[in-house]
């Protein structure tokens, strides 16, 4: 069900910086009624929305991209993609608890993403992450323990149930890997171009 998975402990220094950033930095809230904005509060704000750094470019943790860059390099190598592609990746952090909302079903595919991933930093006892099929059935995959890193196709619909356990903050780092170039085994080179914003075109070249 997963493309790749591994249990990986986030270094203590990164974890502490991440927690401090969530507590202290201006954060973005996102309501399901479509409204959104910046607030000086965090996931515990009066909107009771889960914390997300997805829309907040100012949310930066020193060393976070380097840490996940090495994890992604290992994953891409084991998938046979490290030597055959050029890629970039993005990260965001989310945090949920019993007093906040959670994440409705959605997907991550816009045309160039090849892999989505989720790293559960602090887990709940009950599994929250699920995939959703065409009949809107929820499928709860694999292990979802603290430290579990797992990847899946970005077109797959997924979500997270509301946290029901008291005094628990479910913390994750999620992201997407997007291809810019791909080399097949028959001397073809595929290049993903963006002629205009959010418009992706794949071109194929014979080498």
Segments from the language model and where they lie:
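Catalytic core of non-heme Fe(II) oxygenases with the double-stranded beta-helix
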Residues: 81-162, 167-176, 180-186
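Long amphipathic alpha-helical segments
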Residues: 186-193
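Non-heme Fe(II)/2-oxoglutarate
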Residues: 1-83
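Short, cationic low-complexity segments
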Residues: 30, 193-207
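Intrinsically disordered, low-complexity regions enriched in polar/acidic and amide residues
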Residues: 46-48, 93, 143, 205
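Generic detection of short hydrophobic beta-strand segments and adjacent strand-loop junctions
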Residues: 6-8, 140-144, 205
């Amino acid at each position: 069900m997963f493309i790749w998975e591994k249990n990986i402990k986030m270094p203590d220094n990164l974890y502490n910086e991440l927690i401090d950033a969530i507590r202290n930095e201006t954060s973005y809230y996102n309501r399901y009624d479509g409204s959104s904005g910046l607030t000086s509060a965090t996931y515990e704000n009066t909107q009771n929305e889960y914390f997300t750094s997805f829309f907040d470019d100012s949310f930066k943790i020193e060393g976070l991209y380097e840490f996940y860059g090495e994890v992604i390099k290992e994953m891409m190598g084991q998938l046979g993609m490290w030597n055959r592609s050029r890629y970039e990746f993005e990260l965001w952090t989310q945090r949920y608890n019993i007093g906040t909302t959670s994440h409705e079903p959605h997907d991550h595919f816009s045309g160039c993403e090849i892999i989505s991933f989720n790293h559960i930093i602090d887990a709940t006892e009950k599994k929250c992450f699920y995939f959703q099929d065409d009949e809107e059935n929820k499928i709860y995959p694999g292990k979802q323990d603290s430290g579990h890193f797992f990847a899946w196709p970005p077109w797959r619909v997924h979500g997270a149930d509301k946290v029901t356990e008291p005094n628990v903050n479910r913390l994750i780092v999620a992201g997407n890997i997007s291809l810019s170039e791909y080399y097949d085994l028959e001397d073809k080179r595929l290049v993903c171009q963006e002629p205009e914003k959010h418009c992706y075109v794949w071109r194929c070249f014979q080498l």
